């Protein structure tokens, strides 16, 4: 990848077109072609060769720029990545982005993933590895109308629920297994709250830090919100994924990116202004109100700092947590029981303690 100019700190979302080889498309079947700029992966040199030289790195996100990505933007905006010898370009995602294709096609060096996809990749013999988990709790929520007698998730049984296609291989099988949800409840979610607002009997999916506010503003009411992570659905979220080849051959680069990203998150919670400016530049539809709401909910519900992350630092992961999630989802029929889920992650780059990341 060519050296990214100093201007990249302010212009770090790139668009273009990516055409992946047939072998990658076959390995990562189920995705679609994604707008991006093809780049080479920095695998030959893990550290700057001379003083002041930075290693170019591209990080792909899973959605449009928002508070849930704030720590990564903060590490760019405040120079934390540069302090770790990295010149980071953040490549914004969207609803049609297939992160596995981008990662395995070497269009990005790291990608923002989640536990279910990481284990599914191992099931499909795709060599990618989760190296950190920024969110201990998945922000996925189900949202219902007030005054409909819906007090908990079990009360949604029998109601129409607007969900995305991705839900069919993530949280929906869990809801079927634990709460008795059925196929006939599903409605197609097009990332627009309109259908939900028109049907008081319905519910819809969303992100804790986004859709509830949008519904409150558009619908004029406070929705009932259920965080799935507080109701038995326990994957890691907003993870950092890398190709196994990079993890094995260039661990120093992986460590520097993970450390800098985590430090960016601590910085973001202290003063989000630098990152928020960049987020708004790259996603003009994002507002100060939405960003403030997002940060508030991330902290209120302990998405990033809870469980092991309270002592081991943001990004923390444990073998026990991965095992618990795998067994829950295997019981729900999402994963084959003989999958070696331990190949989906490594603890080598995290769990260094909060003080380490605040230095």
Predicted region positions:
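Post-signal peptide N-terminal segment of mature Sec-exported envelope proteins
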Residues: 37-53
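Short, glycine-/small- and polar/acidic-enriched structural segments
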Residues: 48-189, 193-198, 202-209, 226
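Conserved C-terminal helix/tail region of periplasmic/extracytoplasmic solute-binding proteins
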Residues: 320-359
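Bacterial lipoprotein signal-peptidase II cleavage site
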Residues: 29-38
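Short helix-capping segments at alpha-helix termini
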Residues: 80-84, 179-181, 218-220, 285-288, ...
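Pocket-lining segment of extracytoplasmic ligand-binding domains
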Residues: 116, 191-195, 199-287
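N-terminal secretory signal peptides
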Residues: 1-27
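Secondary-structure end/capping motifs
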Residues: 249-334
